Amino acid sequence: MADNYTPRMKKLYDDKIVKAMTDKFGYKNAMEVPKIEKITLNMGVGEATQDKKKVEAAAAEMELIAGQKPVVTKAKKSIAQFKLREGMPIGCKVTLRRERMYEFLDRLITIAMPRIRDFRGVSAKSFDGRGNYAMGLKEQIIFPEINYDRIDQVRGMDVIVTTTARTDEEARELLRLFGFPFPIEAQEKEAA
């Protein structure tokens, strides 16, 4: 990427979100304002126990979505019922930081989420108590990088947004300002 290029979401954070968060929560220092630290994408491929090529296909799709090569995750323990042995590839994950993270966040919010079938916003209850947010996507085909005709099967993935926020309330406000579509009822309950 060029030296003078700043992702749209990073610019939004610097120009508007820092000020809005400071006004709402009364931070004394700009460094206190929570920010998104990293976004982790995880795709579990259970069918990989029978066919090793499934993990390779999943990793290739994730590389297209994230713009970064994923790490293949391996089984930590052997489980006989699942025909799983220790060290077998069972999925892939990728951790996005800095510019790539902001670019992915932009694509997720503006392009991918509106393409989800029967989409009514993301759950406001998926915070972990420490200001991190996790959500599941049922289909990888919501991303425009994935060619529907080339996929072998529809797979879901987990998207974990790790923030520096100390509370869920701060994290919810941060993600709302970034454009995460939380349902209106959740925002009204929070205000009451």
Swiss-Prot record:
GO cellular component: ribonucleoprotein complex; ribosome
One biological process term in Gene Ontology: translation
GO terms for MF: rRNA binding; structural constituent of ribosome; tRNA binding
Listed transmembrane segments: none
Keywords, in A-Z order: Ribonucleoprotein, Ribosomal protein, RNA-binding, rRNA-binding, tRNA-binding
Pfam families: Ribosomal_L5, Ribosomal_L5_C
Domain of life: Bacteria
Assembly and binders: Part of the 50S ribosomal subunit; part of the 5S rRNA/L5/L18/L25 subcomplex. Contacts the 5S rRNA and the P site tRNA. Forms a bridge to the 30S subunit in the 70S ribosome.
Biological role stated in the UniProt entry: This is one of the proteins that bind and probably mediate the attachment of the 5S RNA into the large ribosomal subunit, where it forms part of the central protuberance. In the 70S ribosome it contacts protein S13 of the 30S subunit (bridge B1b), connecting the 2 subunits; this bridge is implicated in subunit movement. Contacts the P site tRNA; the 5S rRNA and some of its associated proteins might help stabilize positioning of ribosome-bound tRNAs.
NCBIfam families in UniProt: PRK00010.1
HAMAP family on file: Ribosomal_uL5_B
Protein name per its UniProtKB record: Large ribosomal subunit protein uL5
